Each structure stands twice: as C-alpha cells, then as structure tokens.
C-alpha cells in the first residue's frame, strides 16, 4: 500500500493492485512511430496490469506501525514467509493464465531484490528493503524456475520487456507518490531489434494532473489514465482494527491524469 500523509495529517492510500492497474493502462497504450508496441502485446500488458497481485493478501488485512500507529507504506512491509507465499501464489496464478506473463511477473519480483538486475539506471528508488535473512531461498528457487522457463523464449526480447515493465512501474509509482513530478526514467527501450537508441524519459508536471512526457511514448496524445485511491481524515490509529475499519469505510476516489507531449 502506498501511504501519503498530507500536511494536515490526513492520508492518501493507494493499493499496490490499484497502482498496478495504472501501470497496465500505460502498457496498453505504449507504442507509436518512435516507440515499439509491446510484443507479445497481451502478455506484456497483462504482466504490467497484475504485477503486484501478490499484495492482495496484505490489502485484505493491512496494518499499522506499532510505534506510531500510522499505516505501513509498502516499503516498510517485511517480506516474511506469509508475504513471500502470497508473491509465489501470484506468480503461479499468472503462469497458469499465461506463462510469459508469469515469467515477467516473477522476474520483476526477484528483480526488486537484485537492483532490477542493473537494467535501469534511473530512478534508484523503490527497490525492496526489509528483507529477512531467510529470503535467499525465495530468490534461488524462483530464479532457477525463471532460467528454465526463459529457454522457451527469445532472451533479448524478454529483457526488453522486463525493462518496459520497470518503466510502466516507475511511471505509475511517480503518479501515485507525488503531486508535482520532475523525474527521469532510463534507459527505456524504443525497439526490439536493438538498433534504435534507448530513451531517457522525463516526466514533468504542467499543471495539476497534466503531465508532460518527453519523448512521448503513447498512442494517444494526450492520453487519459485513471488511478483509484482512498482518503482518510486522520493519520494515526489506536490499533490495526481501527485503521482497517477506516480504510474499509473510505470511499474510493478516481483521479484522472492527462499524459501529453511537451
């Protein structure tokens, strides 16, 4: 869960699964004369849209920090065995639907613990912290399965799609976490043949929720995308049950963003 505290102490709460749906919208519209459309299209878009499905368990019973009473941001949640089981459930679920999507989802999950495999130089934020000592088994088991699955696909194409998935993830995370954007994502693939140069994508707030993206990678200009979030009128709670009651009662609010060329 993405937790943003306003100056007045009220909260904006965004489920990881809602953030992922925003990533999926970006993936679905990716591609124009300068940027290659994702391929295989459905598999890449599906992976982006559901890449954080492993957070459903936590979102069903979110909690607070014991010392502050404030809801935990996703970067504060420890990847203990229950959370790792939820991640592996999501990988298995997606793999049953589409093995390629499942492989992308799995590689994304382990990549968060491996510095995104060095494939992205900017931003450096949003990599996983709070890893338990016994997490290496999770990594080894899933990376072994990934290596076996990857033999069925074009490896260069897969890593291009991995970079694209990170790009969709970052765009959504920026939109979810900030009111004013002035950010960079790189390197961003523009083709699958490796001949076209990689892009340095900038995102800057024009006004309100209108965001300029340069170079512009989408099929519609401007592109309207939507995020669902919740707002709560207090920042701290006496116990987890009090927070969950407020969270469950909060009315979902749809926020539209307009992504445009500079």
Question: Over which residues does each language-model region extend?
Answer:
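Divalent metal-dependent catalytic cores for phosphoryl transfer on phosphate-bearing substrates
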Residues: 3-14, 24-25, 43-178, 182, ...
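An active-site-proximal "capping" alpha-helix that borders the catalytic cofactor pocket
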Residues: 17-31
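Short, glycine/acidic-rich hinge or "gate" loops at secondary-structure transitions
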Residues: 35-44
């Amino acid at each position: 869960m993405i937790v943003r505290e306003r100056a007045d102490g009220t909260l904006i709460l965004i489920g990881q699964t809602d953030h992922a749906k925003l990533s999926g919208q970006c993936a679905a519209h990716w591609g124009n004369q300068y940027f290659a459309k994702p391929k295989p299209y459905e598999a890449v878009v599906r992976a982006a849209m559901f890449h954080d499905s492993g957070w459903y368990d936590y979102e069903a019973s979110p909690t607070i920090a014991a010392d502050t009473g404030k809801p935990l941001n996703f970067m504060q949640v420890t990847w203990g065995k229950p959370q790792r089981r939820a991640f592996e459930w999501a990988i298995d679920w997606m793999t049953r639907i589409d093995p390629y999507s499942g492989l992308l989802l799995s590689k994304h999950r382990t990549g968060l613990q491996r510095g995104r495999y060095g494939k992205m130089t900017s931003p450096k934020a949003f990599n996983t912290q709070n890893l338990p000592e016994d997490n290496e088994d999770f990594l080894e088991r899933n990376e072994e399965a990934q290596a076996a699955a990857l033999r069925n696909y074009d490896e260069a194409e897969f890593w291009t799609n991995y970079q694209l998935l990170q790009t969709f993830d970052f765009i959504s995370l920026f939109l979810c976490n900030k009111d004013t954007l002035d950010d960079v994502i790189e390197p961003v693939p523009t083709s699958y043949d490796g001949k076209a140069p990689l892009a340095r994508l900038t995102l800057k707030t024009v006004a309100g929720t209108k965001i300029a993206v340069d170079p512009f990678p989408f099929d519609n200009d401007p592109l309207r995308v939507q995020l669902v979030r919740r707002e709560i009128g207090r920042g701290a709670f006496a116990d987890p049950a009090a927070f969950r009651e407020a969270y469950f009662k909060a009315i979902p609010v749809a926020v539209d963003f307009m992504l445009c060329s500079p």
